[in-house]
């Protein structure tokens, strides 16, 4: 989310010492707040939320999400809600869409990629929901989006659309459910194994990702080197996800059970 705003010239000046951009309001997701960001003190124009979250693997309840919807409606901010991992939700109190919250249609845009649901990474197929009730001032964002999209994009290639169609077929749904259950098994194996080994871990229940605290005061890249050299395992250093990711590490369930 930061990178797209940097490329669009909206992020402001970068401070190497703090690793932050001047126009970006950072919302830490750490163990101290149970990986659920607190409402910002500054008033934002756009709020990016991703739940179940990448990289932490954590999810929030409908009640917690309703707080953000109410805040956005009160302040006039627009929420861009990334639901890419909703297919991995297992707990009943976790919303699969922001539109389950009252008032969301007047403040939220929802995105969802097929990449994680159906293994479509690289095929570039997703959907965007922009309610007609959503306005900035007197301007309807749906109308602006439709004009922009119709001018700059002719739609996904036909063969990829047919793949997307198959996702919603009876066989497609069954195959996807089987695949997701397979990855959940991997995530559970990683989560429980790390916990038994004494690591502090999060995620892995409503998500394919397990987020762990690096041991022995190692930073993220030191732990990356340690895992690579000692166990021949590659993971993702938490520092790559922003300032609050330092000291954490992401492992993925997207592999074979044997390798996991």
List PLM regions with ranges.
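PLP-dependent class I/II
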Residues: 1-260
């Amino acid at each position: 989310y930061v990178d797209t705003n940097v490329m669009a010239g909206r992020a402001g000046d970068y401070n190497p010492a703090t690793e932050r951009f001047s126009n970006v309001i950072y919302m830490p997701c750490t163990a101290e707040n149970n990986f659920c960001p607190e409402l910002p003190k500054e008033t934002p124009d756009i709020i990016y939320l991703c739940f179940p979250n990448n990289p932490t693997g954590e999810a929030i309840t409908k009640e917690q999400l309703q707080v953000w919807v109410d805040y956005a409606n009160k302040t006039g901010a627009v929420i861009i809600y990334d639901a890419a991992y909703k297919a991995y939700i297992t707990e009943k109190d976790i919303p699969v869409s922001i539109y389950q919250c009252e008032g969301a249609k007047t403040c939220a845009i929802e995105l969802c990629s097929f990449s994680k649901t159906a293994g479509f990474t690289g095929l570039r197929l997703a959907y965007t929901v922009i309610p007609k009730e959503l306005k900035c001032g007197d301007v309807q964002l749906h109308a602006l989006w439709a004009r922009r999209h119709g001018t700059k994009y002719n739609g996904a290639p036909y063969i990829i659309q047919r793949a997307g169609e198959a996702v919603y077929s009876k066989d497609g749904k069954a195959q996807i459910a089987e695949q997701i259950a397979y990855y959940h098994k991997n995530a559970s194996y990683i989560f429980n194994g790390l916990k038994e080994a004494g690591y502090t871990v999060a995620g892995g229940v409503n998500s394919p990702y397990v987020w762990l605290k690096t041991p022995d005061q190692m930073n993220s890249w030191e732990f990356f080197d340690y895992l690579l050299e000692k166990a021949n395992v590659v993971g993702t250093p938490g520092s790559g996800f922003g300032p609050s990711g330092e000291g954490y590490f992401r492992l993925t369930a997207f592999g074979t059970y044997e390798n996991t």
